[in-house]
Amino acid sequence: MKNRVFLATALRTLVLAALAVTAFAAQADWAAGLSARSPEDQVRDAGRKPAEVLDWLGIGRGMTVMDLVASGGWYTEVLSNAVGSEGVVYAQNPPMIYNFRDGFYDKAMSARLKDGRLANVVRLDRDINETGLQPGTLDAAITALNFHDIVNNPGGAQAGAGFLATVKALLKPGGVLGLIDHVGDSDKNNTELHRLDVEAALPIIEAAGFEMASSDLLRNPDDDRIAMVFNPVIRGQTDRVLYKLTKPADGG
């Protein structure tokens, strides 16, 4: 009897170890593909830590994911590497974003996807509530450095709640939303600084009904949070929150 228990335990340990090795190998494989990106993309890796972030969020091979407010598609390409040829990445941008910076984001996304370069990416130039996707389509989604633009405006709390509810509906039960943003302090003008007042945003996020976890991967205590995020002194090295918002398994 003891031998049977021992063998069963040993077998389970070996299976778990094999699964861990396989998962690590898959992550290492797609992360290696990041070196094929442009030098302009790669230079941001030190501050954004894409492989570590996606690993912590649990995003990997074969998943259907969305890059929310993808802008020029930096994270779109990272996600494309992560999910591989059997996965799908929806690069979503509200059409209004293409009016900014003389159409820079449209040009950048078009160049990134030219000639089917990222074959697993579907471009969605639509507002988030008009994607045409069925509820429960996504395994994961990510919004990087965008949430402050939603909640910093008048009526921002309602807009933020609506955004989170829409994304939650698109996620499968157990699906994950990764939310990354520049940290701002409550006593500062975060609209001008392009930062997120975390103290004000947390109640909005917590009320959305996700299971919430946070990581210090992108925190930077050297950022005093008084400079605008595009200031060369701090650009690319801001103090950032990273939240993992998981839709409950019961779909609630």
Predicted regions and their residues:
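A short acidic, Gly/Pro-enriched loop at the edge of an enzyme's catalytic core
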Residues: 131-142
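Class I SAM-dependent methyltransferase Rossmann-like catalytic core
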Residues: 30-54
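S-adenosyl-L-methionine
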Residues: 102-131
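Core SAM-dependent methyltransferase catalytic element
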Residues: 225-252
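Conserved class I S-adenosyl-L-methionine
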Residues: 62-71
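Conserved Class I S-adenosyl-L-methionine
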Residues: 113, 190-215
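A short glycine-rich, Lys/Arg-flanked "PGG" loop and its adjoining helix->strand segment in the class I
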Residues: 80, 158-173
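Conserved beta-strand signature within the Rossmann-like core of class I S-adenosyl-L-methionine
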Residues: 174-182
